[in-house]
């Protein structure tokens, strides 16, 4: 089944679920997308798919009614990052992200680049610490803080720069909501329904646990994309979240 929409970003879902599209072939990605309902989730397009298929893939998803999180994690000099973020806004994406480790001037430039878009601007989110990273990984980079401590420091900088929220692990969510307030959005990868394999994520939670922790948007990949019945899997996840709420 194929759903269509009259605008590039129609925000027709209240679900916090964002499905990560990780496909090597465009046709397979769209075949999967045509099995699910834009009322049940949003979609995330990352570096590999965007490099392979470009902006047209985003348009194809939008034409099917889906809001798109463009997960390119921009990290460059302020002017270059600002132009990239503005280009994403021109594309009509729902959310775009940058690396908080790019610093305050870079994040402020990205924020200012979205001002002309007004209410049509995408959510601007910063990545703190990748969920695959552990304390030993940070130590290798010369960071002596734990992942949780480093993520909180970067999240505070992100809020000070006026961004909409951060990507963080579910374990940080409770503390972040208390520290930064309900309006500061938390986007969390590593969310897997009970019984799913951990994959390459280290700090994981179930959707129900993530919701209880204060996560606003939860990124779920293979448990949905590799499901025999992805539409039903999404409905089951959303039903469990409504019960939790």
UniProtKB/Swiss-Prot annotation:
Protein's GO biological process: 'de novo' pyrimidine nucleobase biosynthetic process; 'de novo' UMP biosynthetic process
The top EC class, named as a word, is lyase
Give the matching Gene3D superfamilies.
Aldolase class I
GO terms under cellular component = cytosol
- Which SMART domains does the UniProt record give? OMPdecase
Biological pathway = Pyrimidine metabolism; UMP biosynthesis via de novo pathway; UMP from orotate: step 2/2
Entry's SUPFAM superfamilies?
Answer: Ribulose-phoshate binding barrel (SSF51366)
User: Which positions, given as ranges, span the membrane?
Assistant: none
Cited function: Catalyzes the decarboxylation of orotidine 5'-monophosphate (OMP) to uridine 5'-monophosphate (UMP).
What does the similarity note say?
Belongs to the OMP decarboxylase family. Type 1 subfamily.
* Stated name of the protein: Orotidine 5'-phosphate decarboxylase
**Species:** Salmonella enteritidis PT4 (strain P125109)
